[in-house]
């Protein structure tokens, strides 16, 4: 590459030409620029001059320091040269002296080597000569490991000098001593009560003494099994300890010994190769060790499971799970102690089983609590002074029963949530059986208990049950509350706590199924209540009809007492029902506060008709006997054409409930009247009673036409069964009823 052309105008260049630079500067620049250039050049010159002075001063100091250093080095080298010369003189003297020693000892070196070898041999011979006595001493001190080590060390010497007659006796003595030791070790190996550590140590010594490997392997597992069985028996007696202490004892004793036996057996018989054994010895030994390990773990875990089962429902669940978590961690560690070993059973199955059993225990506790709550409700109803007083308290009874059940279930669900804590080393939801167990908490515990509630409550409504009416009303209302609120709250809670996707599961019970069962139970109990109260009213009416001589009656002067009693009883029932069910105030149903215009007139009964048919009333007092007789066929036709359903399901309203009771009572009265024969005064008494009922029953019902129809039927049947069909004057009936 060509060199850069020299620039005469560059002041930093070696080819700088001052004359040319000034000539160019005067030619190209103005006066001001020339003066500025001059000032810049002067400034740079001063700066360079200052830097040069600084550099000179610094280098001068360094030069002075270097001069001093060189001077000192010269002085040091002079002293060092003197020392080196002295060292060389001494090294020459040492070399000369060494050559003299070598020459002097050359003749005795071989003799010293021979003496050293003889000394070593004499020491070995001395070891052999004292070996029998030493072995006996070590055995007496029970220092078996040192005795075996010394004997094996001597075997090498015997192998070298064993043909010498002088050593033959020593070898026989040593062999005899070690044979006795071998028998003693074998006896100790088979003795019960040995720890796993001692079994391992004795097994190692027997192997060194050429015990048959296969026999020793089998015997080691047998003896270890006996020792482990003793520990199992000992653990069975530890019933007074809590679960955590019990598991700790098992880990520190049984499992640690088992792990020691397994690792020792593996190192002695599986990891080593023995020339004199069969080729499949190691494989068979590993298989036997696997069987031994799993058999003993199965025994121990069975014992743990029995203990868990005995503690379920009595001990602290958290303590139990802490113990099982600790055991699970220990077994997880045991799975990795030796390559090729497989632990088949783990603690998760025990934990899942414990969860199932705890669910069963909680289910039993829930059922017992529910039974106690029902007993408390029945006792409260029995101790109530009157139905009216009971009615005021029914709301509290229902609230207490409902809240106690819901809160008890919530508490149980929270208690069982401890199985799913994230700090446990196990995760039962990861197992298929564990996932089924979690779903079982929902299905078997919650859903099962809700169905148990429905079943038990429904049983109170059976005809064979002698349940008090108010109890049926309380249970019906409680079921209705569960259907409207409780079921949804509890199922949503369990799905949220246990992360269950019940909406997309085909196997889990849906909320609507349980709600339907609860509503069906509530309906059944309410219908039973209506039947029971209707039956009570019916019995009063039936007895009043059957016990009276209707052919020899006096002219009626008042309403019969039983009719007043019926109205009073209906009033008490209405008070109780009103405390639980609000009246429906729409136009077609609800509690009546005023009578219809028809019933307020001085006429008595209108034939039952639907709203699309015109109402009409029957004035029996205006009919002649022939007219009454001719109306018989029309009444029969009306009976079959306008049938009234008596035992139908009622609605969850006060008006519907009271109407159902009234229908049963009036239907019973109708049937009783049809079976009796009446005189004129008997017919008139029925007329007075029916009018009294019409005057008082309208306020209980929402459909006055239905009541009037049934009362029409009653009076019509009495007319048809009367020997002299003459009714009282309407004014007279009105006066008697108002006075009564």
From Swiss-Prot:
Keyword Coiled coil included in the entry's annotation: yes
Pfam families assigned: VPS51_Exo84_N (PF08700)
Coiled-coil residue spans: 65-87, 322-344
Entry GO CC: cytosol; EARP complex; GARP complex; membrane
InterPro entries: Cullin_repeat-like_dom_sf (IPR016159), Vps51 (IPR014812)
Keyword match Coiled coil: yes
Top-level taxon in the UniProt lineage: Eukaryota
Example GO biological process: endocytic recycling
Protein family per UniProt: Belongs to the VPS51 family.
Known partners and oligomeric status: Component of the Golgi-associated retrograde protein (GARP) complex.
Function: May act as a component of the GARP complex that is involved in retrograde transport from early and late endosomes to the trans-Golgi network (TGN).
Protein name: Vacuolar protein sorting-associated protein 51 homolog
Protein source organism: Drosophila melanogaster
Name of the gene: Vps51
